[in-house]
């Protein structure tokens, strides 16, 4: 049983503050703080939080960030490579088509220069060895024949000898014909030496020179004198654009009484009074193209 003094003393002891006890308590708290490791509040804080961003800056988070970075870098590099391949393929196709077009244009230009006579066959073959000579010659013949055909059909075609019935017909034939037409008039009379030969030559030349108009007229029809008939026949008059450009009287003095078409043709060609003969030109082009060798530098006109 406690006394009043014990109670009083005991109550004082309960409320008594001791500095030694506080110091012991502080030491225990410090010891507990040193021994207990720091524990993360939540496990999620150590993981990556969305889009590869790590909240934790520890070793594990750094490694994950590095792996994610390398993955993105690899994907970007692969995409760049694919884009580069697509670009290279596109450029190569466009460049190839452009080069093919330029090559074809150059071939056509070289061919045109050759046809125009500016380049020999040897130069052409050296410049473009891939083009076959036979192919070139075929193209050349085709174009030359087309040019000759156009020239051949450009003017009127006659192909025969026309008989002039009167003096008025003689004047109309000279004045009313096209200015580009060459007209050859044989003035004749039956029984005059060389008349038959001249008539035969005119018929032959009319077929070989269809663009030239060959005519004949009796000297009596145009009112020629008997003296002219005796001394000047057979006569050959040549007109163009209404003008007399050739006048040959008594042709037998140059060709004799018996002559042929080739003789009369050569005689007229000496004076430049016959145009280029289309049939012979086409034949010469064919023969020259067939016999032309690869190493020859002969130009075909």
UniProtKB/Swiss-Prot annotation:
InterPro entries: Phosducin (IPR001200), Phosducin-like_reg (IPR051499), Phosducin_N_dom_sf (IPR023196), Phosducin_thioredoxin-like_dom (IPR024253), Thioredoxin-like_sf (IPR036249). Residues 17-60 are annotated as: Disordered. Belongs to the phosducin family. CDD domains: Phd_like_Phd (cd02987). Keywords: Acetylation, Cell projection, Chaperone, Cilium biogenesis/degradation, Phosphoprotein, Sensory transduction, Vision. The keyword Phosphoprotein applies. It comes from the Eukaryota. One of its GO terms (cellular component) is cilium. Forms a complex with the beta and gamma subunits of the GTP-binding protein, transducin. Interacts with the CCT chaperonin complex. GO terms for biological process: cell projection organization; heterotrimeric G-protein complex assembly; positive regulation of smoothened signaling pathway; regulation of G protein-coupled receptor signaling pathway; visual perception. The modification Phosphoserine is found at residues 20, 25, 226, 293, 296. Signal peptide: none annotated. The keyword Phosphoprotein applies. It comes from Mus musculus (Mouse). Disruption phenotype: Conditional deletion in photoreceptor cells leads to 50-fold decrease in Gbeta-Ggamma dimer formation and more than 10-fold decrease in light sensitivity. A 20-fold reduction in Gbeta5 and RGS9-1 expression is also observed, causing a 15-fold delay in the shutoff of light responses. Residues 36-299 form the Phosducin domain. This is Phosducin-like protein. It is found in: Cell projection, Cilium. The modification N-acetylthreonine is found at residue 2.
């Amino acid at each position: 049983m406690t006394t009043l003094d014990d109670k009083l003393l005991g109550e004082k002891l309960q409320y008594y503050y001791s500095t030694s006890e506080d110091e012991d308590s502080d030491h225990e708290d410090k010891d507990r703080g040193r021994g207990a490791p720091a524990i993360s509040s939540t496990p999620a804080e150590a993981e990556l939080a969305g889009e590869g961003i790590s909240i934790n800056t520890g070793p594990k988070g750094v490694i994950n960030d590095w792996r994610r970075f390398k993955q993105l870098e690899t994907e970007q590099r692969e995409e760049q490579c694919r884009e580069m391949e697509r670009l290279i393929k596109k450029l190569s196709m466009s460049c190839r088509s452009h080069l093919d077009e330029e090559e074809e244009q150059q071939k056509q230009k070289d061919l045109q220069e050759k046809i125009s006579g500016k380049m020999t066959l040897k130069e052409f073959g050296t410049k473009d060895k891939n083009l076959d000579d036979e192919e070139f010659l075929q193209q050349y013949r085709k174009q030359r024949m087309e040019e000759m055909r156009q020239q051949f059909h450009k003017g009127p075609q006659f192909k025969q000898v026309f008989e002039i019935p009167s003096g008025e017909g003689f004047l109309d034939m000279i004045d009313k014909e096209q200015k580009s037409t060459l007209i050859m008039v044989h003035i004749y009379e039956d029984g005059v030496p060389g008349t038959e030969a001249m008539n035969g030559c005119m018929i032959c030349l009319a077929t070989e020179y269809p663009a030239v108009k060959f005519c004949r007229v009796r000297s009596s029809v145009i009112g020629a004198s008997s003296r002219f008939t005796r001394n000047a026949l057979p006569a050959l008059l040549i007109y163009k654009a209404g003008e007399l450009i050739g006048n040959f009287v008594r042709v037998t003095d140059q060709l004799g009484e018996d002559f042929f078409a080739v003789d009369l043709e050569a005689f007229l060609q000496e004076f430049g009074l016959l145009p280029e003969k289309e049939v012979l030109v086409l034949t010469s082009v064919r023969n020259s193209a067939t016999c032309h060798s690869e190493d020859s530098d002969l130009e075909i006109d």
